[in-house]
From Swiss-Prot:
GO molecular function: calcium channel activity; cGMP binding; intracellularly cyclic nucleotide-activated monoatomic cation channel activity; sodium channel activity
Top-level taxon of the source organism: Eukaryota
Assembly: Forms heterotetrameric channels composed of CNGA3 and CNGB3 subunits with 3:1 stoichiometry.
Residue stretches in coiled coil: 567-610
Full protein name: Cyclic nucleotide-gated channel alpha-3
Sites carrying sugar chains: 280
Domain remark from Swiss-Prot or TrEMBL: The C-terminal coiled-coil domain mediates homotrimerization of CNGA subunits.
Keyword Disulfide bond: no
Transmembrane segments: 112-133, 140-160, 188-207, 212-229, 240-262, 289-319, 320-344
UniProt lineage: Eukaryota, Metazoa, Chordata, Craniata, Vertebrata
Gene encoding the protein: Cnga3
Amino acid sequence: MAKVNTQCSQPSPTQLSIKNADRDLDHVENGLGRVSRLIISIRAWASRHLHDEDQTPDSFLDRFHGSELKEVSTRESNAQPNPGEQKPPDGGEGRKEEPIVVDPSSNIYYRWLTAIALPVFYNWCLLVCRACFDELQSEHLTLWLVLDYSADVLYVLDMLVRARTGFLEQGLMVRDTKRLWKHYTKTLHFKLDILSLIPTDLAYLKLGVNYPELRFNRLLKFSRLFEFFDRTETRTNYPNVFRIGNLVLYTLIIIHWNACIYFAISKFIGFGTDSWVYPNTSKPEYARLSRKYIYSLYWSTLTLTTIGETPPPVKDEEYLFVVIDFLVGILIFATIVGNVGSMISNMNAPRVEFQAKIDSVKQYMQFRKVTKDLETRVIRWFDYLWANRKTVDEKEVLKNLPDKLKAEIAINVHLDTLKKVRIFQDCEAGLLVELVLKLRPTVFSPGDYICKKGDIGREMYIIKEGKLAVVADDGVTQFVVLSDGSYFGEISILNIKGSKSGNRRTANIRSIGYSDLFCLSKDDLMEALTEYPDAKRALEEKGRQILMKDNLIDEDLVAARVDTRDVEEKVEYLESSLDILQTRFARLLAEYSASQMKLKQRLTRLESQMNRRCCGFSPDRENSEDASKTD
């Protein structure tokens, strides 16, 4: 039995070689598997690392976003598929495609407005011209047919876009296609769009293609052109120039239509039948198409602007048309004068306001007999402000915006500046919002001292543009030059305990040229810190560390100095107690005055009763009882 077991337990050389080969193959496969898994994991890690590097948010900016954005970003990062996973061909199970809805405030919608405004403008300019001038229609018939039906295609597409254009309801964009279609069909635009797409040009089959007036219903799409003008005026940086151009365009279109109607009336009455209508086309100089249109345009311009003499009308219909033209011309003239006058006033309003400030300062300096040198410096300072467009009062401009938008604009404008200050690097987002709203732009002239050694520090400054010099007491020797992005005075406004310099300036800083600085006052900082006590303590600790690093703090002063926070709290408590006492005293004084008044009235009544008794009058019983009660 043992022998059998021994024989069975000893494999043959062939079996051993096969097993060794299988074992080696398993080792190779396991090694390749581990290597492949390692390569896949390294590639996944590298892709995530590169993705994180590409989209690493600024930690300073991150503090201005709420937790909702962070949750969204976390969900998006968790939703990234693993390298080994395969997406289903339908894009994911249970995922429903959202319908395409156009946001009316998006750039895509504005670009579509630009595209649809072109065929509308084409129809308004050329349909009437082709209907009145036969040569223009017949000589370029193929071109007009292509343009007409291309415009019709855009009209149809515009109806589809309008049916998918979202609208706001309770502040949210409605994206339900059924509600969008229902909302669109209830508007006047839908009715006009339907009327503008009625295929009236099917009458071409019976009348011929030389009747473009059959397509006049395409003019009902004018609302798209007006909407394009309104949105362009809102988006452009030169609204006054655009308004003037828009007004000129409207005037030219009216003159163009009037010229075409004049030529059509002349054709109806008969060319050359009288002095008012267009001359006889049998003459070669009046037979050309260009001469026909230019002559009609010239007549229309003279009539509507009433600046020239035209041949007087002869027939009744001619008189009626000229009267209507005169009335339209008066309206055009009044509109142009009024609009251009208001636009010019709006364009010159900043200059007029700024010039009024300069004039008032000049009058004051002349009245106070200011030296010519100082007066010249003041005028140059004003010139610098105007030349560099620094005359805008930011608070006045932004006063109509809500606080949230004010904060976002301030963050967008001043965030890069505030990031450069060390003590504000790790502040709370709410405190940073408060601080950026309190930054005030300040401009210094050449040679102006921003601060001098020993002055009490009430502001800190951040250099936006310009150069400042740290000078010696003699005002000549320069130690260092501060440029864009530098800041100073941040420690003095914190009033840190134990500072060797206290809250006084330790250097003389002077402006070399014109310098633009941002100023943050101590009062504004403390007002913002009242709602953030933890941030206040953190700022003070950070300022104390900076002073200790520069060996500018005295530990003995820290130990000996009374805690200013306790003193401030006591002062605040005393102020509140004083307010309460004043209120109580005022109430007691009012009660005392009222009681005195009642007492005087009672004494007066008693005196009158005593006088009556002394004079022999017998008062009634009720009065005597009242007097006894009063006694």
